[in-house]
């Protein structure tokens, strides 16, 4: 019996739990991942002519704030927009850039952007 045949025979006798453990150990040992690669495909437009259609959902991203004196005003506005507590809003502002809201209409996004900019955010 060759080496390969004996390895196949031994692997075939493993339980499911043992096979999972073997997989994890080999991933560590060889520095690889057994995960399947993920492919993202953009949805195809319903009509060929609508390739340049307008975006319908928008995201408001806090990049930071200009003036350290306006930090409190920015935190207050972030709290109003996101319904976060004081501590969470402060951490979010200090760790910018961060997404505040997604899936907004263009008008909602522009309104939030204006409020944040008026408070001193970028």
Swiss-Prot record:
Residues 96-122 are annotated as: Disordered. Gene3D superfamilies: 3.30.1390.10, Single helix bin. This is Large ribosomal subunit protein bL12. GO terms for cellular component: cytoplasm; ribonucleoprotein complex; ribosome. Residues 104-122 have a biased composition (Basic and acidic residues). GO terms for biological process: translation. NCBIfam families: L12. Keywords: Ribonucleoprotein, Ribosomal protein. Homodimer. Part of the ribosomal stalk of the 50S ribosomal subunit. Forms a multimeric L10(L12)X complex, where L10 forms an elongated spine to which 2 to 4 L12 dimers bind in a sequential fashion. Binds GTP-bound translation factors. Signal peptide: none annotated. One of its GO terms (molecular function) is structural constituent of ribosome. It holds the Pfam family Ribosomal_L12. Forms part of the ribosomal stalk which helps the ribosome interact with GTP-bound translation factors. Is thus essential for accurate translation. Belongs to the bacterial ribosomal protein bL12 family. It comes from Liberibacter asiaticus. SUPFAM superfamilies: ClpS-like, Ribosomal protein L7/12, oligomerisation (N-terminal) domain.
């Amino acid at each position: 019996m060759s080496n390969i045949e004996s390895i196949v025979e031994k692997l075939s006798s493993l339980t499911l739990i043992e096979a999972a453990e073997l997989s994890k150990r080999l991933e560590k040992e060889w520095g690889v991942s057994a995960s399947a690669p993920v492919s993202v495909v953009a949805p195809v437009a319903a009509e060929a002519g609508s390739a340049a259609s307008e975006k319908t959902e928008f995201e408001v991203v806090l990049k930071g704030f200009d003036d350290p004196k306006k930090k409190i005003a920015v935190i207050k506005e972030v709290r109003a927009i996101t319904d976060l507590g004081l501590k969470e809003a402060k951490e979010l502002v200090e760790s910018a850039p961060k997404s505040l809201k997604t899936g907004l209409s263009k008008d909602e996004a522009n309104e939030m952007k204006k409020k944040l900019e008026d408070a001193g955010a970028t």
